[in-house]
Amino acid sequence: MTYIVGLTGGIGSGKSTIAHLFMALGVPVIDADVVARDIVTKGSELLSKIVDYFGEHILCENGELNRAKLRERIFRHPEDKVWLNQLLHPAIREEMLRQLQIQTYPYVLWVVPLLIENNLTAFCQRVLVVDVEPETQIQRAMQRDNNSIELIQHIMASQVDRQTRLQFADDVIQNDADLKGNLPVLKQKVLELHHQYLQLANAQNA
């Protein structure tokens, strides 16, 4: 059985940056956000169901899902969020578990923003949390996604608080510093964790 390291953190914490550093070391990465995008690509059955429910205006001109519009819609209408989650979550979980089962590397990095909220930590042998100050989260998310502070604060409120997240952590990467100046530090931390996870995985599979 592949050793599973669950990677999580709040919005704007830098999960993708950390995941890419592990990926550069040859570690297979399964990202819930990537899976969520892949299962609703143009022409997919799930996208058709989303269009039937929300209408054609939820699409971009090229026929792809307009994620910004969808995000704003479910922010304004909680009942739509419930419907969407009921549609997508089983499909996302099924695809992630399929990908986990076919891995042959000693361990896999499983990137799930709502790892704790969706009670998925039980699937992990180790939990790695990317931790930042709430102010950093807001600043980064606003710059990255061009979202309103209202929407970002709403997303943060829907996630577990920082203290709760840290209680689930076996390992923590502090990521408040500016990325450009802090990248060597992050690379070194990821390399240290990589060696640690290889040892743990090899011990489990011995």
Curated annotation (Swiss-Prot):
Biological or metabolic pathway of the protein: Cofactor biosynthesis; coenzyme A biosynthesis; CoA from (R)-pantothenate: step 5/5
Binding site for ATP: G12, S13, G14, K15, S16, T17
GO cellular component: cytoplasm
Catalytic reaction equation(s): 3'-dephospho-CoA + ATP = ADP + CoA + H(+)
Main enzyme class: transferase
One Pfam family here: CoaE
EC numbers on record: 2.7.1.24
SUPFAM superfamilies cross-referenced by the UniProt entry: P-loop containing nucleoside triphosphate hydrolases
Main location: cytoplasm
Any one of the GO BP annotations: coenzyme A biosynthetic process
InterPro entries per the UniProt record, alphabetical: Depp_CoAkinase (IPR001977), P-loop_NTPase (IPR027417)
Domain DPCK: 4-204
Superkingdom in the source lineage: Bacteria
Keywords recorded for this protein, A-Z: ATP-binding, Coenzyme A biosynthesis, Cytoplasm, Kinase, Nucleotide-binding, Transferase
CDD domains in UniProt: DPCK
Cysteine disulfide partners in this protein: none
Subcellular localization(s) per the UniProt record: Cytoplasm
NCBIfam families, per database record: dephospho-CoA kinase
Protein name listed in UniProt: Dephospho-CoA kinase
Species: Pasteurella multocida (strain Pm70)
Taxonomic placement: Bacteria, Pseudomonadati, Pseudomonadota, Gammaproteobacteria, Pasteurellales
